[in-house]
């Protein structure tokens, strides 16, 4: 641990095998599945400057500002607390394109779970309507869906076997992306992957409101350690870490049981 002396720490139990497997069930995901990457269609990182990004723990919103090729970008991103849904509002002087990229899982342990050189081992299909679309993903025996809706003048197209582009024709794009494994809610045929009914999902404004209300409740109804009167100069940093840890707990451990250790960020 780079402290200049040996230190002892506990390891997970390895024997007997049944006990080890029970520990692994809570500790590790046997087949990590990367559901997708959503990002701006900006290919040259060297053209990006004046980066200013911060996470507002009080509302759960990530606010990002930067310039790309001398064009300004402002991106606001939130997550709906009750759905597997993210929502983003983008304003820019330049071109606005959002890429949905999908990779095959690696099955590894200490990587990002993405194998980008195995396009033929999985498949992505797109069905679009006015201001909405359903992306159907097939990976081995796994089938899941991403429902996308947007506001503004934009079009969505498939640019590769496992790549989708949502391109705005204006200076603003607001969209939501809902990940869903149960096709019944979408009215999707399990065999064809074709949707018969595209439902409404919350837009950016509604997601931002739900996120803000959820985090307000989390911070005002819970408690935390106040180190404001502690004279030790390390108190401020310790308090910052406590608050950040509580945020991560609220964001990642809201289920009935703790998530697998290898699934944490």
Give short role names for the model-derived ranges.
Residues 1-265:
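Aromatic-residue-lined binding/catalytic grooves and analogous aromatic/hydrophobic interfacial grooves
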């Amino acid at each position: 641990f780079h402290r200049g002396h040996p230190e002892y720490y506990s390891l997970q139990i390895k024997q007997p095998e049944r006990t080890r497997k029970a520990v692994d069930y809570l500790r590790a995901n046997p087949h990590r599945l990367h559901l997708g990457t959503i990002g701006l269609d900006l290919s040259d990182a060297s053209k990006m400057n004046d980066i200013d990004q911060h996470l507002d723990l009080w509302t759960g919103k990530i606010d990002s500002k930067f310039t790309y090729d001398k064009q300004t970008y402002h991106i606001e991103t939130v997550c709906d607390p009750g759905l597997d849904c993210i929502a983003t509002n983008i304003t820019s002087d330049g071109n606005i394109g959002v890429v949905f990229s999908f990779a095959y899982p690696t099955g590894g342990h200490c990587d990002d779970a993405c194998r980008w050189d195995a396009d033929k081992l999985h498949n992505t299909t797109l069905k679009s309507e006015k201001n909405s679309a359903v992306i159907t993903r097939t990976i081995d025996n796994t089938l899941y869906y991403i429902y996308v809706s947007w506001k503004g003048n934009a079009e969505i197209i498939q640019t590769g076997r496992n790549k989708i582009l949502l391109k705005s024709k204006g200076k603003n794009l607001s969209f939501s992306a809902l990940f869903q494994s149960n096709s019944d809610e979408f009215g999707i045929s399990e065999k064809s992957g074709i949707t018969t009914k595209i439902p409404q999902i919350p837009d950016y404004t509604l997601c931002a409101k739900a996120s803000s209300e959820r985090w307000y409740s989390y911070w005002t109804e819970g408690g935390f350690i106040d180190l404001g009167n502690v004279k030790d100069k390390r108190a401020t940093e310790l308090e910052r870490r406590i608050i950040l840890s509580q945020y991560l707990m609220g964001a990642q451990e809201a289920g009935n049981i703790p998530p697998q250790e290898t699934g944490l960020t």
